[in-house]
């Protein structure tokens, strides 16, 4: 059956800021308390979406979540009118106000894990929103994520949107940032690849400096609820040493697409066994795995973390050729730039490299791959997505003007205490739901 991979990028929200909330994410910690530019951040992401859509890739948009989250702040004991809640939180616990104000839902690679209909037992596309329970500012996202996905993918004959797994460390789930899929063609049955950082109920290596956010148990549970074929499901453990070096998700150290795995040599525990298992599973489905392994001598783990070489999008053009979408930081790192030049000239599976300015997102630890959720859809499934979320000239112009109207060009930590920011955000989101035709998506609209 004919199918295409669509990328749904998260629009950066109006409260985009640098609060250093993500322990284990080096860029996030390094830029803590610096001033952010939400308008620039949103436009950088929007331009990436538009350029990829112009190149013929299926490109969708996911709306931001409402921030600051008054629901969280009230749950934490702050009371009164909305402005009073914000003022009390700013005075008594500014770190909690920062968590409630984070625009981290922009990184939709963490929104959910998605299995296409070609892989599932019931022949429907399955979504499991990630519980993101390792970080407070992200653990509050999954309910709104489920609501958004249920709105966009509403046809129960074609789509299943599950609840998130129970938010406990034993089931820590970070979504598609630790998942990829290999296949001969998008519409054919494929091999789903889950990468975890630790296992809750069996002994094994674990990082010592930074936490492993994804558990084996969570990955297995997602695969089981999606009804995946066990012979086409592969699990691998991320090397704990690279987690300690700042690789907080697998998509910071490897990326896959169709029959290609682009990875650092230190990405996995027992890497050869991982490659062999993937190869055997993919062979059974009519494709041969191509592993492009980047040696540590050419690009160190530190180079990978600072440039986000592997937090790239690997996309297939209609003619089957592949393009690697990287942040401009890859061109600013001499080792990575030299490697990419050799890669493009090698006449291998990856024939082209596209470079984007995503500086505002990168300063919070999010590159091209963080900003998108991959959803493989057949023609009929795509037609069932009736909201105005597919990027084109008209939607781009509407969103670009919307950003100009509603977004600030500077937010410093102290600005989160401004009650006007809540009103500005709600006004913007209310208008956005009309642009995207998603109905009353937010609590304040209900």
From Swiss-Prot:
Catalytic reaction list: N(2)-succinyl-L-arginine + 2 H2O + 2 H(+) = N(2)-succinyl-L-ornithine + 2 NH4(+) + CO2
A GO molecular function held by the record: N-succinylarginine dihydrolase activity
UniProt pathway: Amino-acid degradation; L-arginine degradation via AST pathway; L-glutamate and succinate from L-arginine: step 2/5
Binding site residues for substrate: 19-28, 110, 137-138, 213, 251, 364
Xref: NCBIfam families: arg_catab_astB (TIGR03241), PRK13281.1 (NF009789)
PANTHER family registered for this protein in UniProt: N-SUCCINYLARGININE DIHYDROLASE (PTHR30420:SF2)
Protein name as annotated: N-succinylarginine dihydrolase
Annotated source species: Burkholderia vietnamiensis (strain G4 / LMG 22486)
């Amino acid at each position: 059956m004919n199918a295409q991979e669509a990328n749904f990028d998260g629009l950066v929200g109006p409260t985009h800021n640098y609060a250093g909330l993500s322990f284990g994410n080096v860029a996030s910690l390094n830029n803590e308390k610096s001033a952010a530019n939400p308008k620039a951040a949103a436009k950088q992401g929007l331009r990436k979406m538009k350029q990829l859509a112009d190149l013929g890739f299926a490109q969708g948009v996911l709306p931001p979540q409402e921030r600051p989250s008054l629901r969280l702040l009230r749950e934490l004991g702050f009371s009164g009118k909305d402005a009073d809640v914000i003022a009390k939180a700013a005075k008594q616990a500014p770190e909690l106000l920062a968590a409630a104000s984070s625009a981290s839902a922009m990184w939709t690679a963490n929104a959910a894990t998605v299995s296409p209909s070609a892989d599932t037992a019931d022949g429907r596309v399955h979504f499991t929103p990630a519980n993101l329970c390792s970080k407070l500012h992200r653990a509050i996202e999954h309910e709104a994520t489920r609501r958004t996905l249920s709105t966009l993918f509403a046809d129960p004959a074609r789509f299943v949107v599950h609840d998130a797994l129970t938010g406990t460390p034993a089931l820590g789930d970070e979504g598609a940032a630790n998942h990829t899929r290999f296949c001969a063609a998008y519409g054919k049955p494929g091999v789903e690849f889950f990468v975890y950082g630790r296992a809750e109920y069996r002994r094994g290596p674990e990082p010592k400096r930074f936490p492993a956010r994804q558990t084996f148990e969570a990955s297995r549970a997602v695969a089981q609820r999606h009804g995946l074929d066990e012979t086409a499901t592969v699990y691998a453990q991320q090397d704990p040493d690279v987690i300690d070096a700042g690789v907080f998700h697998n998509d910071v150290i490897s990326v896959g697409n169709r029959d290609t795995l682009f990875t650092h040599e230190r990405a996995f525990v027992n890497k050869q066994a991982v490659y062999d298992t993937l190869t055997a599973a993919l062979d059974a489905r009519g494709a041969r795995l191509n592993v492009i392994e980047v040696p540590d001598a050419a690009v160190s783990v530190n180079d990978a973390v600072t440039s986000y070489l592997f937090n790239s999008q690997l996309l297939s053009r209609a003619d089957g050729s592949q393009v690697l979408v990287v942040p401009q930081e890859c061109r600013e790192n001499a080792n990575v730039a030299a490697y990419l030049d050799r890669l493009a000239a090698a006449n291998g599976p990856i024939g082209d490299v596209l470079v984007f300015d995503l500086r505002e997102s990168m300063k919070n630890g999010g590159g091209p791959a963080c900003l998108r959720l991959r959803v493989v859809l057949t023609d009929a499934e795509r037609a069932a997505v009736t909201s105005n979320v597919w990027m084109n000239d008209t939607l781009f112009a509407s969103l670009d003007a919307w950003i100009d109207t509603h977004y600030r060009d500077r937010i410093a930590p102290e600005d989160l205490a401004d009650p006007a920011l809540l009103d500005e955000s709600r006004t913007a989101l209310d208008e956005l739901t009309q642009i995207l035709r998603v109905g009353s998506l937010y609590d304040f609209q209900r």
